[in-house]
């Protein structure tokens, strides 16, 4: 059923659907990597569409934080995701200087 729904959606919608599934199958504070990693891939594709770019950028910040915090147990992989979120956040707060959500998720990725 989920695969059928995802087929008719644009990249942002696919990413959001997977982002919303990020906790499925989680145990305590450990989540499975597939939903969030696949969501990130769809958000990256959604960046290419000006109609979905801004939402995709914000979801990427949220997604890198989630994957670093709840998927990776290896400190280097966690750090890589948090650093990616930080780098993207720095770019996005320059692009959207008055956006509280971008500033918030940038700060969250700083730890």
Task: Give the ranges of each region predicted by the language model.
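Surface-exposed, active-site-proximal loop segments in enzymatic domains
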Residues: 24-27, 68-77
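Canonical positions in the second alpha-helix
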Residues: 46, 91-92
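TPR/TPR-like alpha-solenoid repeats
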Residues: 63, 70, 109-110
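Short coil turns that delineate tetratricopeptide repeat
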Residues: 51, 97-98
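Extracellular-facing segments of soluble proteins and assemblies that are Gly/Ser/Thr-biased and enriched
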Residues: 101-110
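N-terminal leader/linker segments that initiate helical-solenoid repeat arrays
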Residues: 4-64
